[in-house]
Amino acid sequence: MADSFPNLLDGKALAQEMQADLTLQVQALQTRVGRPPGLAVLMVGDNPASAAYVRNKERACEQVGIASFGHHLPTETTQAELLTLINQLNQDPRVDGILVQLPLPNHLDARALLYAIDPTKDADGLHPENLGRLVRSEPGLRSCTPAGVMRLLQKYNIELRGKEAVVIGRSILVGKPLAMMLLEADATVTIAHSRSTDLAEIARRADILIAAVGKPGLVSAGMVKAGAVVVDVGINRVVEATGKSRLVGDVDFAAVQPIAGYITPVPGGIGPMTVAMLLDNTVCSFQQRNGLK
């Protein structure tokens, strides 16, 4: 796809590069410490999309040599049972990273579960201690999707200092931490959201425009300044008239791609980078916990 569109930010290719590097790192670390890094993934219920994401993460772990500890629990699992399991994983010396696959069934308190994870094993970078470290520009495990966006921009030498960056979306998963990372890179950052007045006018100011809402086709050509860098974090499954489904982002790719200076595709953009950063966080946690970093 990158050959067809020369202005693509190819997250899939960069993720493959990162995983090749991580494979070598893991081999060296296993030789030095006597075990590989380990990632525990907790999934509750039978959400098909979540199951697919978990399989993808487990497959990626296997490819780079990270030990994967899967915990697929029934929908009726209680909060107390999950907290007990997380505490056990916090104490397990084989486990360097813990991830709770979201969303969870409605009877579970996701925030309390995320808070229960040892911050040094917070592979998703969502514990308040790690988010606080981000705000203070201190070392810590970073949220995977925002960190993946930043790594991709860095790969393509996208200048951020002094640039206008607009993030559409204010979630704790993407929008807020990504805005902080852009600010740390000396961009001038605006966060837009569902209550923003005249979203199109705000978006058109952006040198770097990031859509992270989960609304197919939200960003149209009329919202993009010529030459802007457009990063599409949205992953939405839409059903076509034929009955077949396909993945699309929050950006109308066909309309925006000819205008943009750079643009990420969906799929093949930020999704693979999120998984690569999850692996990277797990390896970083392993190194820190073994006094190697």
Swiss-Prot record:
Metabolic or biological pathway, per its Swiss-Prot or TrEMBL entry: One-carbon metabolism; tetrahydrofolate interconversion
GO cellular component: cytosol
Catalytic activity, as annotated: (6R)-5,10-methylene-5,6,7,8-tetrahydrofolate + NADP(+) = (6R)-5,10-methenyltetrahydrofolate + NADPH; (6R)-5,10-methenyltetrahydrofolate + H2O = (6R)-10-formyltetrahydrofolate + H(+)
Pfam family, one: THF_DHG_CYH
Keywords: Amino-acid biosynthesis, Histidine biosynthesis, Hydrolase, Methionine biosynthesis, Multifunctional enzyme, NADP, One-carbon metabolism, Oxidoreductase, Purine biosynthesis
UniProt superkingdom: Bacteria
Residues bound to NADP(+): 169-171, 194, 235
Quaternary structure and partners: Homodimer.
HAMAP family: THF_DHG_CYH (MF_01576)
Protein role: Catalyzes the oxidation of 5,10-methylenetetrahydrofolate to 5,10-methenyltetrahydrofolate and then the hydrolysis of 5,10-methenyltetrahydrofolate to 10-formyltetrahydrofolate.
NCBIfam families given in the database record: PRK10792.1 (NF008058), PRK14186.1 (NF010783)
Name of the protein in question: Bifunctional protein FolD
Organism name: Cyanothece sp. (strain PCC 7425 / ATCC 29141)
